[in-house]
Design a protein with these regions (language model features):
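Structural preference for solvent-exposed beta-strand-turn elements
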Residues: 1-411
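Compositional signal for N-terminal targeting/processing segments
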Residues: 408-429
Length: 429
């Protein structure tokens, strides 16, 4: 049974000891899937995230003609062991100008950007398209770089949908790509550069995106390009919700909430969350935190002092306009939040319950669900949007300790609690 359209999180009222496992990193999983498809042999990805975004990537690879086997993971419901049979850098041919091969990328930015570069290594014509929000998200810097390399990209708006004409490898071709809007443009090119024979120069001042480019470079260096096994580490952004939950109740004796196997590779910028939470007087998305800064923003009204969050411009062009969304929904709950340019100042506030609009954004749903563990009356609209990266998030909240937090989650109809959810009803599919 699917998650209801509107749920209420009941605050925790007793100590709990928990160690939470979180699924694999989305960022690493989708990068690894591209590299595995380009490998010369069979690559087994262990601990890979199985969510909407990664399923989209797998389905696109299968549509292209790659053999991809997906097996359950015994340790984590939303992980999989994914085996990809690479063909030495060869990408199967696409369609024709009259009938391009259609690749649907949903609202998955990594799939949209990485596949745009990837299909250039094939022959034939490919059409990438997604949901309406994905058609609003930027692509221009990537398309410009692909054209510099000699590939034909047709898109009147330089966004999706786009028709890409594959031309195979182009040895010695050069391009430069800006990361001012998104690091995914550079990552797309760097993932395919070796097999494409490309020389890629990354330009632009954007410290908040640089860690993601560094992740790509480190992953390319460490990957088993001739076949083998590769372990995906847990997703630090997903782990931030449970570290935040632990802080909410730190004043209670015997209330440790830990995240199992917290990432230690330094590949994920959000692995720094434990160093920046609770947040200092000012905190930037420019090199300090990535998406987990949303967790810090959402919980900041409960801090003893105001916090200034800086360099949030990138949040505006993701799954939703996140700066607006955070300010709007926190204000509903009674928080004092001031937006100036790409900053938010969040002041200590006495919060109350409210119905939270998630804007179909998985991180909005999860951030405010954590707030609901402390603040009575938090109701989450469209909670199933967490399927994008963490389908069993609400199962983790509701499961009995030590594997979960033991929170009650209720369906809401006509403003009233109608029934408490149980078991698989917490899963977003």
């Amino acid at each position: 049974m699917a998650l209801p359209d509107l749920i209420e999180i009941v605050p925790l009222d007793k100590p709990v000891r928990a160690e939470i496992t979180v699924p694999g990193s989305k960022s690493i999983t989708n990068r690894a899937l591209i590299l595995a498809a380009l490998a010369d042999g069979e690559v087994m990805l262990e601990g890979a995230l199985w969510s909407e975004d990664t399923q989209i990537m797998v389905e696109c690879l299968q549509e292209l003609g790659f053999m991809v086997n997906v097996e359950p993971d015994a340790n984590e419901t939303c992980n999989r062991t994914i085996t990809v049979y690479g063909d030495g850098g060869r990408v199967p041919p696409g369609g024709t100008e009259q009938q391009p091969m259609e690749l649907f990328v949903g609202n998955a930015g990594t799939a949209a950007r990485f596949l745009a570069a990837f299909v250039c290594l094939g022959k034939g014509v490919y059409r990438l398209h997604g949901v309406p929000r994905m058609h609003e998200r930027p692509q221009a810097a990537l398309f410009k770089a692909l054209r510099e390399l000699g590939y034909r990209v047709e898109s009147p708006t330089d966004k999706l949908p786009a028709v890409i004409h594959g031309g195979g490898p182009k040895l010695g071709a050069k391009c430069q790509v800006s990361i001012e809007e998104s690091s995914q443009f550079a990552s797309a090119l760097l993932l395919c550069a070796k097999q494409g024979g490309w020389e890629v120069k990354v330009v632009g001042e954007n410290a908040e995106e640089s860690p993601y480019v560094a992740m790509t470079s480190k992953l390319v260096e460490a990957f088993p390009h001739r076949g083998g096994k590769f372990q995906i580490e847990p997703d630090a952004s997903s782990g931030s919700y449970f570290w935040g939950a632990g802080w909410l109740f730190q004043d209670r004796e015997n209330y440790p909430i830990n995240v199992a196997q917290w990432p230690g590779s330094s590949w994920q910028i959000d692995a720094q969350f434990t160093s920046y939470f609770p947040p200092p007087p000012s905190l930037s998305r420019n090199g300090q935190l990535g998406d987990s800064i949303m967790t810090a923003i959402t919980l900041s009204p409960l801090m003893p002092n105001k916090v200034l969050f800086l360099d949030l411009g990138r949040l505006r062009v993701q799954e939703c306009e996140r700066v607006f969304a955070l300010r709007t929904e926190l204000t509903k709950c009674g928080a004092k939040v001031v937006e100036e340019g790409d900053t938010l100042t969040v002041c200590p506030s006495k919060l109350h319950g409210a119905e939270i609009e998630t804007y179909n954004d998985h991180r909005m749903a999860m951030c405010f669900a954590v707030l609901g563990l402390k603040v009575p009356g938090i109701k989450i609209r469209n909670p199933a949007c967490v399927k994008k990266t963490f389908p069993n998030f609400f199962q983790k909240l509701a499961a009995a300790p030590p594997n979960g937090l033991g929170a009650e989650i209720w369906e809401i109809k006509d403003g009233q609690r109608t029934r408490k959810l149980s078991g698989d009803e917490h899963f977003a599919d």
